[in-house]
Amino acid sequence: MSGTEEIRWVTLGYVMGAFGLKGEMRVRSLTERPDGIFDHPVWWLFNPKQKTRQEMRLGSGRLHGKGVVATLAGVTTREAVQALFGTEIQVPRSMLPDGGDDPGVDGIWADLIGCQVVEVDGTELGRVVEMMATGANDVLIVRGGPEGEKLLPYIEEVVVELDLDRQIIKVKLMEGM
């Protein structure tokens, strides 16, 4: 990567709070497999309020109930974790597997989160804030539109165009959506 190339950051999860007293943290993972967030030994914690990003090394991680619990090197107290509450866990897009030149409906989740979702007639539905695996197909969780939250199946019949460069997903809603 050249020095002039801008890094595209991908949010893999969020620090949700402390777990216990010894620096463990509850993490909301946005990866397809919740423990997939542990595939990345280095996390960049982005504070959206301060617009700062801090590189941290993953200490340990494990599944716990429906979520995940992690430790970071150098973060050893509950108070230190509390200071990280709400930060986004990010990695450079270049550190994720390549979805190919035309990912179609096989694009990886990280590429879809943050995309604007628009109906084929131009009606804005919101942005993809999360993905969900259902077994039959993946589901886009879309928020921020006039109709509130929408759950859209990530299938060819619904996703008619995917423009990752412009971060736009065009959809054709099925009856009842």
From Swiss-Prot:
Gene Ontology terms for molecular function: ribosome binding
InterPro entries: PRC_barrel-like_sf (IPR011033), PRC_RimM (IPR056792), RimM (IPR011961), RimM_N (IPR002676), RimM_N_sf (IPR036976), Transl_B-barrel_sf (IPR009000)
One annotated GO biological process: ribosomal small subunit biogenesis
Domain of life: Bacteria
Alphabetic keyword roster: Chaperone, Cytoplasm, Ribosome biogenesis, rRNA processing
A single cellular component GO annotation: cytoplasm
Domain PRC barrel: residue ranges: 104-177
Pfam families linked to this entry: PRC_RimM, RimM
Compartments where located: Cytoplasm
Similarity section: Belongs to the RimM family.
HAMAP family: Ribosome_mat_RimM
Free-text note on domains in this protein's UniProt record: The PRC barrel domain binds ribosomal protein uS19.
Complex formation: Binds ribosomal protein uS19.
Annotated function: An accessory protein needed during the final step in the assembly of 30S ribosomal subunit, possibly for assembly of the head region. Essential for efficient processing of 16S rRNA. May be needed both before and after RbfA during the maturation of 16S rRNA. It has affinity for free ribosomal 30S subunits but not for 70S ribosomes.
Name listed for the protein in its UniProt record: Ribosome maturation factor RimM
